[in-house]
């Protein structure tokens, strides 16, 4: 099985388990910069060199050896389930992707047909009822996660805990897990704990939000998208995320964590 979704600097200073929609573009660019003293020109997800990735066959052996011996600090970054799935909806369902097409070809037409969502027309720029469409998308996302129908869940809305757990189950151990909502604090702790060829000054690092501008702007406060049924669906899908990463399931308007992440608890519960 190995370590899918895992990136590592070429200097082997640090190992990162990617969780989609959790600042991964920015983190990837920081790792790249820490080795090379410059940013990757383009979306870091497209980088085929300069950063070890499990998806590159020539990287798998070095990542595997490092993780199995815990030679470098390993970390990941997590996000509030409410804002994460809302972001996935606007980016992946409503938005036009970097290649000028809809995400995953026939995915969006299928969700439009089967679940009656609207996405703002062919270019994603038209007006539509964002709240009603998002709530219908939630039903679709729940069906993919709970019943694996009409398709398997996509990595952008499958549970964060699922992404985090594969690293543990296959023999890795995290030294740090931090919240997207407290990004600078968490990323700084990682940087303080490692030695890199190039020093990173977080205050000068831009935010590489590669999904920004793909889809329509969110028009309402986060909590307006979640009625009682929506909150029930979100909890059904992301119960472990709320519990293990200490987010408030009862209040969609509070994106901040309400407790401290316990690494021993994470490894015990997600390593089963």
Spans of model-derived segments:
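Membrane-interface amphipathic segments in extracytoplasmic regions
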Residues: 1-272
């Amino acid at each position: 099985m190995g370590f899918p979704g895992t990136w590592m600097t070429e200097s082997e200073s640090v190992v990162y388990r990617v969780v989609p929609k959790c600042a991964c573009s920015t983190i990837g660019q920081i790792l790249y910069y820490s080795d090379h003293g410059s940013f990757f020109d383009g979306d870091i997800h497209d980088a085929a060199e300069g950063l070890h990735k499990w998806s590159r066959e020539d990287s798998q052996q070095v990542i595997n050896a490092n993780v199995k011996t815990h030679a470098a600090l390993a970390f990941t970054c997590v996000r509030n389930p409410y804002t994460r799935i809302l972001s996935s909806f606007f980016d992946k369902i409503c938005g036009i992707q970097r290649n000028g097409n809809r995400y995953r070809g026939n995915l969006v037409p299928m969700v439009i047909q089967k679940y009656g969502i609207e996405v703002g027309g062919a270019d994603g720029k038209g007006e539509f009822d964002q709240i009603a469409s998002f709530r219908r998308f939630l039903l679709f996302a729940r069906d993919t996660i709970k019943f694996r129908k009409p398709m398997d869940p996509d990595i952008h809305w499958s549970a964060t805990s699922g992404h985090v757990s594969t690293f543990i189950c296959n023999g890795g151990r995290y030294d740090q897990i931090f919240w997207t909502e407290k990004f600078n604090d968490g990323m700084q702790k990682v940087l303080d704990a490692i030695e890199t060829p190039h020093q990173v000054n977080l205050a000068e690092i831009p935010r590489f939000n590669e999904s920004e501008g793909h889809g329509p702007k969110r028009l309402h406060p986060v909590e307006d998208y979640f009625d009682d049924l929506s909150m029930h669906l979100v909890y059904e899908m992301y119960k472990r995320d709320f519990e293990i990463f200490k987010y408030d399931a009862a209040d969609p308007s509070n994106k901040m964590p309400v407790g401290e992440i316990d690494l021993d608890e994470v490894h015990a519960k997600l390593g089963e």
